[in-house]
Amino acid sequence: MKKTKFAVIVLCAAVLLLAAVLGYEYLSKNYQPENEVPSGETSSEATLAPDFVVYDGEGNAVNFSDFAGKPVVINFWATWCGYCVKEMPSFEKAFAEYGDEIVFMMIDVTDGYQETKEDAMKFIEEKGYTFPVYYDTDLSAAGVYGASSLPATAFINAEGELVHGQLGMMSEESLFGYIEKLLEK
């Protein structure tokens, strides 16, 4: 009886394992990533980047359209977001290298509860970051760019076309690759 029970358990485990392997193989072959663009390349389908209003540290309104004719890197972040904090040194490095050629908009997603302007300002000061920081106090900028999770980054060329958008942490290599592509035109 024990041997039969053991054999049935082993057989069931083997069938489940085989089903998992075959399912994985099937799904892997049919997987098509959405909007994936290799580092340093741009999508062939450019979309005009939507305009929005954010606020600088003094509370002055800043329109995205104020930067028309210049390439722009937008990064949506918050102090409570571990991946945002982790990628910030790469953005600081990129700003130091390309800040004269590209507009950097580091947009703090400021909901007033989980993230406040004061939290963000203190964080930026403590870390010594020099890139420009803006505050999305009504979450409208994050909304029009589909920043449903943080961090989120968008690359806009000088023609105002959104050439790449990414949800999630960006490697330094990818960040610099997309910046180089923005500067090619």
Regions found by a protein language model. Name each.
Residues 1-49, 185:
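N-terminal targeting signals for export/organelle localization
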Residues 51-72, 96:
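A short beta-strand-turn-helix
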Residues 70, 88-108, 125, 172, ...:
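Conserved helix-turn-beta segment immediately C-terminal to the redox Cys motif
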Residues 73-74, 104, 153:
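Hydrophobic beta-strand anchors of alpha/beta hydrolase catalytic cores
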Residues 76-93:
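Conserved redox-active cysteine motifs that mediate thiol-disulfide chemistry
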Residues 102-115, 130-138:
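Thiol-based oxidoreductase modules, predominantly thioredoxin-like and allied folds used
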Residues 121-159:
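Short, internal strand/loop/helix patches
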Residues 155-185:
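Thiol-/selenol-based redox modules, centered on thioredoxin-like
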